[in-house]
């Protein structure tokens, strides 16, 4: 820290009582200066020789009845008694030390006392300006300290432009080439630096942690000045906002709903809304994770609708960067669910809107498809997780969210299957119709062999879906290698679907009869049907690895599914009776 010493005489100020200060000298005092609740017994000559304001006040002063000294009251001097005492010592030529912590108070007090060059050469205002310009404002940390102290001395600090000069100094240094930074700064994130940067390198965001010490209004002014001057990348501005939020917002890293103090809530709400307004417009300036943390905090602190909409829009632009944990946003108290599912639905809608806009601008299809694939994977994982923890999640809401990404490209539907399976597992009380509707979200042709193996043994899935999976697995096994695994090109898709409908028609009769049987009979019936289905689908595979499935074009009756050469047998009739 820079400092400056003024004067050479020893300090002879002493205290008589708690609120009385005087100069220990043989010469009797002849003026009493009252500053707040402190009385200073001083001498007119050294004071009046340097202060134009005291000259004016002494002309209209009253006399102290006890000491016959003239009495001056200056209750509104910036900095109060401590600042006035430094100014008085300067008038006496006594040694005083100035630094970044007291320079604002003394500079404003000197301005108040009108200690200008017109009164005496080398007066206090001049010396303070020399110290500020040659030392304080050239120091990174001193400039920040001075800027912080200016708040307590408005409007005087503003009148002498101390705040503006500090802002300019800080912005100039922040925009400087990091290679030229040769002063100390606070940086506790070095472990996050890329491996190619050694410990001696200065990171481009070297300044952001020091600015996190500022109040939000000063921080906003500094960042605005930095952006106006240019030379700092939007990504670094975004990093500064994230570091500031992490330091200043309680529970920012982990969503916190414990907000009992209304005054604190209002303060944090204002801070959040200010940070949102400061977000750079560039898409890559802030991470999706940071935006989601802001959104979570805005829910906790009940920020305005405008801020939430802006955050949702920004998140929608880069939703593919999020992870499942990011989307677990706690709902306001009193809701049906623990987590806010509606807000996730809004984020998906925003993503869809943004991709449509990119399509209109003829953006690369590969980029859009890649983003959609990532979002589809994200939402599949989210649905699986939210199904696990939300017992009140409705089938309608589950399907609504899943359908929003149903047309997005996927390498497989394993994620969709896992989400459906978890939903059925955690919500056993849903109706058969709801099970059927939710299961339709999955394309059985796009399941991996591992997922198929799990699904065919999954008792939670409707039997019709299990039959479809078995059928398409058989088709996949018998299709020539040159054809797509899903068998979904041209007329082959129509034929496959018709054949599958014939196979799955078996389940219709089974389901009807199942409703009339006991629990044990249901299990037995399903086992018989499943055994029969396996037999029908894999007969061909046992014979030279090729199966032949024929079906009626119109009938969905159980008898419409036969293998070549298969005839009605007593066992067949027994299966139908059991089903």
Curated annotation (Swiss-Prot):
Biological-process GO terms, alphabetical: cellular response to auxin stimulus; flower development; positive gravitropism; positive regulation of flower development; protein localization involved in auxin polar transport; protein ubiquitination; regulation of auxin polar transport
Modified residue annotations for Phosphotyrosine: 417
Primary location: membrane
Keywords: Cell membrane, Cytoplasm, Membrane, Phosphoprotein, Ubl conjugation pathway
Superkingdom of origin: Eukaryota
Domain annotation NPH3: ranges: 205-476
Family: Belongs to the NPH3 family.
Designated name of the protein: Phototropic-responsive NPH3 family protein NPY3
Record organism: Arabidopsis thaliana (Mouse-ear cress)
